[in-house]
């Protein structure tokens, strides 16, 4: 949902009985972090002054100079389909506290891409940037890892693996390196992938 004003967002919150508003950011390693406030506290001041956070815990600043603010981006708002409490979630920008006004933190990923687009247009390279990330990952049933002075080990397992042929598979086990575009019933995660795709489409992410 693309909110253009805080009034539109507040109206949606009331109409849909949203109880919490969640703000998502990434740290220096690219991991999601979030700050959550009651929906009743989400107002014009939130958009103007932002939400304060300690940038040192994100890897963005030293402890002695770590005060930063998060400014929400209403155009990224969506209802969190996984939260048990009705929650509106959105991303935004990390800013360095400064006077007379705060300034964008130049290492924050969203600010990096904004500068890249600005440079692209100013230099005449192009007038539009299209980014198509590939959602590639593995699904495991169990992952174990251990690091000790005398030992480093990692163990993974999935029911689709060829080493599980003795686990009452009734002939449906995928052979070694034979799982590319495999069909049912060997493809055990079709429903999982389909649900992921539907959720992304609902959030405006077009899936090829």
Predicted stretch roles:
Residues 1-208:
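Glycine-rich, acidic/polar active-site loops that bind/position phosphate-bearing ligands
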């Amino acid at each position: 949902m693309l909110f253009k004003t805080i009034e539109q967002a507040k109206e949606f919150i009331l109409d849909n009985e949203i109880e919490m508003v969640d703000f998502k950011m990434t740290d220096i390693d690219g991991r999601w972090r979030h700050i959550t406030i009651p929906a009743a506290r989400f107002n014009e001041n939130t958009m103007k002054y932002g939400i304060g956070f300690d940038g040192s815990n994100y890897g963005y600043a030293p402890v002695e100079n770590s005060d930063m603010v998060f400014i929400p981006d209403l155009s990224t708002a969506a209802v969190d389909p996984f939260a048990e409490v009705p929650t509106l979630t959105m991303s935004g920008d990390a800013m360095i506290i400064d006077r007379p006004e705060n300034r964008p933190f130049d290492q924050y990923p969203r600010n990096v891409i904004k500068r890249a687009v600005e440079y692209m247009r100013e230099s005449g390279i192009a007038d539009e940037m299209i980014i198509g990330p590939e959602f590639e990952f593995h699904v495991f049933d169990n992952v174990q890892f251990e690091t000790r002075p005398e030992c480093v080990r990692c163990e993974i397992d999935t029911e689709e693996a060829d080493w599980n042929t003795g686990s009452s598979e009734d002939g449906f086990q995928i052979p070694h390196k034979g799982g590319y575009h495999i069909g049912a019933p060997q493809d055990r995660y079709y429903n999982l992938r389909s649900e992921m795709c539907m959720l992304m489409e609902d959030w405006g992410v077009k899936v090829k």
